[in-house]
């Protein structure tokens, strides 16, 4: 499942198969990019905001929103199923989490779901439902959930050039599942990337989405500890990473049901990543 990292320079300690660090990349510009992403799953009446490419056309990276434009926070959930986990799903292991999605709907929390193409193939009805619900937005988490750097804490790897095709394959899987409005946002598997990755993916026109708050829900069994980590970490403009899989993140629904009312009590408003990017560009 997905490795986690607080920041690109943070020290990661979440286990061999579930921890990751991206190397330092360019700070994303706050000016909107004028070019339509070539990997958008389908045309949209309203083009989602993206960041302008970095120096030399490098893929821009977004970590968090503005700290000075009100108490807004974006919850993100990685629906990550690795390409070789089909037999486990066939034997009854659950890589989805309908209870979590139901909780988000009941609590009226907008959220961004970073989905692998393999997950969309396994759960096409859920993928289509998420894509058709305006409360949510779906973005790309690759097809296979293989890392695009040589070492990413135990994930299988592929080079960046093959990784670019893997991301395009995910958009194809989304369309086949009936999900036709996936955004031109990409979360690297494990959060791992380097300069070579950013160069290779620049041709896709995507904005890479990282985070500044690690929930710690991956493989966690103590919902209270995860809740505390989220509440202690959130600041205005935060992007929180969590997971949408019963298999590897069984406490997440309970965490959400506790954290959401507490953050609202503290004055926070929940937004999607696209709204957070828009806020960083001066649009609300």
Language-model segments: residues:
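N-terminal pre-catalytic segment of deacetylase/amide-hydrolase enzymes
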Residues: 2-95, 127, 258-284
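Sec-exported extracytoplasmic/periplasmic mature domains
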Residues: 105-109, 131-132, 168, 172-179, ...
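His/Asp/Glu-enriched short active-site or ligand-binding loop at hydrolase and phosphoryl-transfer sites
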Residues: 193, 197-234, 268-279
């Amino acid at each position: 499942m997905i490795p986690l990292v607080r920041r690109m320079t943070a020290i990661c300690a979440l286990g061999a198969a579930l921890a990751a660090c991206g190397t330092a990349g360019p700070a994303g510009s706050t000016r909107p990019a004028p070019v339509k992403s070539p990997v958008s799953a389908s045309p949209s009446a309203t083009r989602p905001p993206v960041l302008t490419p970095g120096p030399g056309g490098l893929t821009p990276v977004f970590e968090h929103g503005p700290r000075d434009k009100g108490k807004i926070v974006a919850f993100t959930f990685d629906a990550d199923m690795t390409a070789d986990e089909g037999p486990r799903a066939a034997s009854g292991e659950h890589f989805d989490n309908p209870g979590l999605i139901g909780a988000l709907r009941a609590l009226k929390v907008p959220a961004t779901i970073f989905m692998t193409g393999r997950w969309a193939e396994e759960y096409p009805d859920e993928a289509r439902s998420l894509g058709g619900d305006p409360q949510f937005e779906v973005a790309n988490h690759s097809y296979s959930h293989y890392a695009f750097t040589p070492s990413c804490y135990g994930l299988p790897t592929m080079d960046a050039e093959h990784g670019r095709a893997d991301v395009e394959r995910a958009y194809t899987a989304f369309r086949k599942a009936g999900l036709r409005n996936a955004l031109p946002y990409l979360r690297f598997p494990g959060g791992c990337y380097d300069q070579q990755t950013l160069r290779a993916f620049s041709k896709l026109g995507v904005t890479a989405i990282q985070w500044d708050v690690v929930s710690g829900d991956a493989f966690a069994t103590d919902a209270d500890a995860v809740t505390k980590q989220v509440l202690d970490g959130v600041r205005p403009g935060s992007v929180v990473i969590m997971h949408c899989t019963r298999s590897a993140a069984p406490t997440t629904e309970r965490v959400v049901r506790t954290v959401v009312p507490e953050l609202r009590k503290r004055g926070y408003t929940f937004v999607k990543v696209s709204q957070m990017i828009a806020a960083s560009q001066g649009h609300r």
